[in-house]
């Protein structure tokens, strides 16, 4: 396929109108056109690779935690219609019993159309009761490796990210024990700089919605954000101009580098 007159993002950080081709499922430039090849006129529309959202909760009136296949399919279809072709929806802070139902639906999902369900982001319940945000404090608990493994088995191995507040009793041990089985993210936390550094040394590699639901930066208490920067962590940003000021978004890209920043919807 040839896509003509598309706005393409270039190395100069600008959109430039040009033609591109699809070969073996990949975008290429400068390939030789084939005889009778399908041609699509983008008419100045943007042409981008399919996006991946690793942290959102639902769409079009459906929540991933509803544990409903029809709702999950509606979410997947909507995400694909907006250019998000792979999704890793997030669970909320719930009991193991409720989480079991969510994992069952995810494991049974067929990915026949819409965005592919490529993982689950387990945002709770191993968080700080002092930084619950929109989570339900009733279900906050200490991180439990056995519980995580039961949920992982139930999901068919779909859990790719687990959020942990490392300062809570027992949670550092969870990081040490499970970091080889799943990616660990520091989140919904009151942790200080030293504890965050310890968590990264123990195996955490990620920070959930940087700046939100965590201590900020001061010159005498650098907190988890500076620890994440020093340790080269991957960090999420909610770039809706509400959760974070645009200047802070620019600051984060300039300090962490674009290869460490992950834009999320958290919708």
Predicted segments — roles?
Residues 1-48:
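Histidine-rich, glycine-flanked metal-binding segment
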Residues 6, 25, 44, 55, ...:
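Divalent metal-coordination and catalytic microenvironments
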Residues 45-67:
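Di-metal (Zn2+ and/or Mg2+/Mn2+) metal-binding site signature of metallo-dependent hydrolases
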Residues 50-52, 185, 261-264:
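Residue-level marker for buried hydrophobic side chains located in beta-strands
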Residues 57, 73-101, 115-128, 155-167, ...:
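Divalent metal-dependent hydrolysis catalytic cores, especially in the metallo-beta-lactamase
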Residues 95-101, 167-169, 185-189, 238-255:
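Active-site glycine- and acidic-residue-rich loops that bind
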Residues 122, 129-145, 149-223:
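Divalent metal-binding pocket/active-site signature
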Residues 195-267:
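Active-site-adjacent C-terminal substructures of enzyme catalytic domains
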